[in-house]
């Protein structure tokens, strides 16, 4: 267990609004497209602080923030196994959405990335 912890939160204020559906949830309304305003909290731990007395240098997290924005900022998140995946790409070709594929969608699956 780490001795020092630090957290970084990317909240609703940076515009992480995405839409997705659960293609395997044919028993509920979750198989329909629905949108979320997303937020992410990352916790970092270390046994020894760096020379600035930090557990993590937040300045080094710019690539993480960019990945979050590229993946979730007004994006249509599609499960790679969604049987209707091509239809989302048809919408993207018409400039009606921006598709990002994931190996599973939902809060739990997004946390795995």
Stretch-by-stretch model annotation:
Residues 1-113:
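Charge-rich, low-complexity N-terminal segments
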